[in-house]
Amino acid sequence: MREVMLSECMNLLYESNFVISKPFGRSCFDLIAKKADLKLLIKILKNIDSLSTEQSEELLNIARILQAVPLIIGSRTRNSVMEEGAVYERFGIKAVTFLTFQEQVRGIPPVVYANRGGFFVNIDGKALKETREKLNISVGELAEFSRVSRKTIYKYEQNEANPSAEVAIKIEEYLDVPLIKGINITDYFEGVNLPKSREEAFEKILKEGEDFKVKVIEILGDMGFNLLETTKAPFDAVAEESKNKGDEVHNVLFTNIQETENEEIRKKAIIVDEISKIFNSHSLLILETRKNEDKKIMSMSIRELEKMGDTVDLIDFIEKRKKSKDI
């Protein structure tokens, strides 16, 4: 079932002119997709409740740095089959069925979202109040017809509460005006979580006995990068260099950090390089000692890294090396 959804999703994105990555295994996301300014990090799950807290935190944090939208595509929750056309949420990440996602990609957003107590919709509170007053309908009259309290109608008008789908339809019928608003599941948002502090990241890596990785991350941090260490992604860390405060233009560096190089690590580095190209960013494999020059991989020894002064020096070095290697 999951493999079918993954295949369907890839076909849909390809047909809709997205640039897409190859699927990833054992990662907090399965697909990366980009079209113009829209960037998606997609996780495919049969049961959306199988997403772990650790996976969700990492997915949110990676999405924040990449200015991308994290999205779960699934078919059921722990207790029931997911409703078509409804938006669910897990750990602050929107979750929908494949068909709902397909409709969104084709320009038809869902209007219903699942929450405790049932299914609800977003309505235009200002339009509700203006229409009610224009038609000279009292709050009490509308409340009685909709079978909710006067206080609830006031909350709808102030956009302090949203009605159930059933109540919203009643209000629309009574006022004869469209009020329900679509939910754009691909809207960019600032991630709910923030990257862990360097101290927290170091503590976690040290527990796993990865002193070399700690040393590299510390060097990158001292250079001025905003770092996110990852355990559920194809890369070991993603580093962000903001050119100016509040500037939307920034450099992102995907890094793989390994003491020794082998065929498996090279394959992983090539995959990460493909990711970097989708985001028009950079990738770098950092090794204890760089032995062989590989045209397909941008690599650097830790000694070379230590010679870099700051983020600008490193990015310039990578860009010059890219031109000389023609990659």
Curated annotation (Swiss-Prot):
Pfam families: HTH_3. It comes from the Archaea. Keywords: DNA-binding, Transcription, Transcription regulation. CDD domains: HTH_XRE. InterPro entries: Arc_TR_HTH, Cro/C1-type_HTH, Lambda_DNA-bd_dom_sf. Residues 128-189 form the HTH cro/C1-type domain. The keyword Transcription regulation applies. GO terms for molecular function: DNA binding; DNA-binding transcription factor activity. Residues 139-158 bind DNA. The keyword Membrane does not apply. NCBIfam families: PRK04140.1. HAMAP family: HTH_type_cro_C1 (MF_00584). This is Putative HTH-type transcriptional regulatory protein Mevan_1514. It comes from Methanococcus vannielii (strain ATCC 35089 / DSM 1224 / JCM 13029 / OCM 148 / SB).
